[in-house]
């Protein structure tokens, strides 16, 4: 069966992502996620054992990364799987690369000595995913996001929310099903509206409670509510955090943020009112900044204003407005 499958799919066209207008770090994943193949549980088991299959281990949600000669995700073969404890949960299917090579991620947090697995790849170590994402190739950061978010979901949702029975992973990790009540559970993605509010040559930015007594400011943001359009979520969050009414909401771009599993929906919005009425339970400070001050901060030449770095969608929303790019 496996030989027949590989022969039939050897020349299958690979769907390369080339339609993204603005690709952030943690986006740009080029894998074909193999929706058809992941529905065949027996095929998945056989794919894991293929000689060319590649696995990306994570230890406490830190991916294995190789630093020499260039930073990249460190993929290894499947031989180490036989020694994994049962609580590791098994490999989760990520998809196929352009050569139709299957790729999986696996959580090895239950392993007592992860250095032995790290040693299976030359010059590799388990690293913080956020730090590694700025150094590895762009499309690999998208793979990292997919793998980290999925493994974290499995670790946090082992038990059925209906009856409490331990559930089982299916579809290569894209579903858990309860063996007792047959309830199906799917990985969650939490949508977040993040927006830069502007009026002429000024924009509004805020400082959260975690950043108090610093010069760090960023876009306003908040989780979307159920039954809420993106534009409505933007307006609500701006009103809640800054007390400002807005109009002319424009979509800019989006960014997966796998800490743990958010989708940042980036927008720009024009202020309809300008008086700030900040919510002190959410924010330390909210204020207007001039375009000139923002441009200096983007060049790291403004000691009174620090902005998010390029890893974050907030940086690109701010930069887009400051440079008249929207």
Regions flagged by a language model, labelled:
Residues 259-264:
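A short, glycine/Asx- and small/polar-enriched loop/turn
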Residues 176-218, 223-224, 245-246, 269:
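N-terminal strand-loop-strand
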Residues 75-78, 175-180, 249:
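Short Pro/Gly-enriched beta-strand edge/turn motifs at strand-loop
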């Amino acid at each position: 069966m496996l030989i027949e499958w590989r022969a039939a799919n050897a020349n299958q066209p690979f769907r390369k992502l080339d339609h993204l207008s603005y690709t952030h770090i943690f986006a740009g994943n080029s894998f074909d996620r193999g929706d058809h193949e992941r529905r065949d549980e027996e095929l998945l088991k056989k794919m894991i054992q293929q000689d060319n299959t590649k696995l990306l281990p994570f230890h406490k949600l830190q991916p294995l990364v190789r630093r020499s000669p260039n930073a990249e995700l460190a993929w290894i073969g499947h031989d180490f799987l036989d020694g994994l404890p049962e609580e590791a949960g098994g490999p989760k299917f990520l998809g196929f690369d352009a050569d139709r090579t299957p790729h999986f991620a696996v959580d090895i947090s239950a392993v007592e000595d992860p250095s032995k697995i790290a040693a299976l790849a030359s010059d590799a170590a388990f690293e913080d995913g956020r730090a590694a994402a700025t150094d590895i190739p762009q499309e690999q950061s998208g793979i990292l996001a997919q793998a980290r978010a999925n493994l974290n979901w499995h670790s946090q949702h082992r038990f059925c929310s209906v009856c409490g029975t331990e559930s089982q992973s299916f579809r290569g990790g894209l579903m858990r099903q309860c063996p007792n009540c047959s309830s199906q559970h799917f990985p969650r993605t939490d949508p977040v509206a993040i927006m830069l509010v502007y009026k002429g040559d000024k924009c509004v930015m805020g400082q959260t409670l975690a950043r108090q007594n610093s010069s760090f400011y960023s876009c306003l943001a908040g989780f979307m509510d159920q039954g809420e359009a993106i534009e409505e979520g933007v307006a609500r969050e701006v009103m809640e955090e800054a007390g400002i009414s807005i109009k002319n909401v424009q979509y800019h771009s989006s960014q997966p943020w796998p800490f743990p599993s958010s989708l940042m929906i980036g927008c720009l919005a024009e202020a309809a009112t300008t008086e700030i009425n900040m919510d002190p339970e959410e924010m330390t400070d909210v204020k207007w900044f001039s375009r000139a001050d923002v441009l200096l901060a983007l060049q790291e030449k403004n000691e009174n204003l620090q902005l998010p770095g390029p890893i974050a969608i907030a940086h690109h929303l701010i930069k887009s407005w400051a440079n008249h790019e929207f």
